[in-house]
Amino acid sequence: MSKAVGIDLGTTYSCVAHFANDRVEIIANDQGNRTTPSFVAFTDTERLIGDAAKNQAAMNPANTVFDAKRLIGRKFDDHEVQGDIKHFPFKVVDKASKPMIQVEYKGETKTFSPEEISSMILGKMKETAEGFLGTTVKDAVVTVPAYFNDSQRQATKDAGTIAGLNVMRIINEPTAAAIAYGLDKKSEAEKNVLIFDLGGGTFDVSLLSIEDGIFEVKATAGDTHLGGEDFDNRLVNFFIQEFKRKNKKDISTNQRALRRLRTACERAKRTLSSSAQTSIEIDSLYEGIDFYTSITRARFEELCADLFRSTLEPVDKVLSDAKIDKSKVDEIVLVGGSTRIPKVQKLVSDYFNGKEPNRSINPDEAVAYGAAVQAAILSGDTSSKTQDLLLLDVAPLSLGIETAGGIMTKLIPRNSTIPTKKSETFSTYADNQPGVLIQVFEGERAQTKDNNLLGKFELSGIPPAPRGVPQIEVTFDIDANGILNVSALEKGTGKTQKITITNDKGRLSKEEIEKMVSEAEKFKEEDEKEASRVQAKNQLESYAYSLKNTLGEEQFKSKLDASEIEEVTKAADETISWLDANQTATQEEFADQQKELESKANPIMTKAYQAGATPSGAAGAAPGGFPGGAAPEPSNDGPTVEEVD
């Protein structure tokens, strides 16, 4: 049975789950947390992912990368990307019209694509799952916002490939959450369920009908750039102004102060979901000035009022697209951490005439939960829970080609069930036209210039004929991941041409992906090497200190000459001084130092043991070898306790 997992790759937090024995297990990371911050940090010595990266963000803001999901599959000059760059403490540069993230790592300037950063987070989730399942994990279902377009989906799939995963399927987050909601409610009559998913960076609304294990998405809408981060930004800007007013100083250029303020704002926002008021206390925020202030829930709601209200537009759109009156919605399911905000809950409830939302699923874990169920189905799990489950999802945006006059001619309207295939016949615009340029767009506007160009290709070699005579059949084929293939066939000659829309301009080529896969493996090796180096250092340090402690005990003093004790103590002190001066030494150097110290200490310690001394510490504190035994090699199972920063 392959160990397939479901991964919710979130803007701010990610989560991984596994389905086995008729139930879903949300897998906790090495810190015991069931969600992992989507942060990657680069330092002079190592790369950190998850909690460790987020915890050091204030000390290293320029090299701590987050929100990669807000960049993935977008172009550098996208106005939302430009807006985000203003807030980011790390550097985003333009490379072939694609946003690339620039950081300092081990003293060198490195450039990473958003796919690579996302792949590091996916790799971390993969490791988390492997630690729990005790086996290698290859297959995964990865989720994306329902409103992600073709290039964003393709880029997310590429990130999975770079992380060494086989992405079995890309599924929409609200659909995954609907599975989490409906898995145990199979036998009930048909229900219309509205999923309202407001996360850290994206917002989706989907309306599904659930009946007898069939989950059919009727319509979907959303905003791929609205979430908790935007609420944090409002708080941060508000407090920057307050600090300016009180202290006549502008902290907006100091990245470290901003990061500390943002962390405090995020915490305050969470507190305001359960309290009416909270205080913010940051010591020495800027130029030694302490920042103590407070904020009420009412003020927070006022700061974000327009953002909160804007969440109802997609709800309207979904209901009108699905041609369903709001009174016909049986359940409203809230997903995503931001739906804990009381004002958001109230807006939704009021919109549905006072109907209370369903709170039966965990908003942080529901998406990974549903993805894990889908992963189990795709890998052939035979559980009674999953066997009759069928997912019917939709394409979020209309797809079509440009026809004469820059008109968008739609082949697949939005909210068409996928997978789907649609053909239409077109002809030439001029007499004796030798070829046609087929340009593929997605979007809802009448003119192609207002929509998003996905890709284009040429069908040439059309025999000379009057306009309107040649018949060119264009076929659009959307697969289950929501990714598009387009082909064109000239019926007279049988000439055919096809492309998978892989957004030629922004998409990584096969070679680039392969290069990134090998780089990802190299980074992983470096991470492991650094971990072994730190372990060797800790082992040497604990050995030197344990020697000193042991020699300080009375019973040892009585069994050994003062000169012997002094000799070993001096050697241990020298090692400790060497350690202080050489924190960045290699694993081999630490091992050599340990051998050297052992060669001085072992004969003397052995003599003490033969004379009957036993240390009062734990047995493990007995340094060196036992009588007649050789000194133990510094093994890799040394201290398993780490320092706390």
Swiss-Prot record:
Residues 611-621 have a biased composition (Low complexity). It is found in: Cytoplasm; Secreted, Cell wall. Disruption phenotype: Does not affect cells growth and hyphal formation. Leads to high resistance to the candidacidal activity of Hst 5. Induction: Expression is repressed by treatment with caspofungin. Keywords: Acetylation, ATP-binding, Cell wall, Cytoplasm, Nucleotide-binding, Secreted, Stress response. Its main location: cytoplasm. CDD domains: ASKHA_NBD_HSP70_HSPA1. One of its GO terms (molecular function) is ATP-dependent protein folding chaperone. InterPro entries: ATPase_NBD, Heat_shock_70_CS, HSP70_C_sf, HSP70_peptide-bd_sf, Hsp_70_fam. PROSITE patterns: HSP70_1, HSP70_2, HSP70_3. The keyword Secreted applies. It comes from the Eukaryota. Residues 581-645 are annotated as: Disordered. It holds the Pfam family HSP70. The modification N-acetylserine is found at residue 2. Belongs to the heat shock protein 70 family. Binds human histatin-5, an antifungal peptide from saliva. The regions defined by residues 128 to 135, 150 to 156 and 333 to 337 correspond to Hst 5-binding epitopes. This is Heat shock protein SSA2. It comes from Candida albicans (strain SC5314 / ATCC MYA-2876) (Yeast). The gene is SSA2.
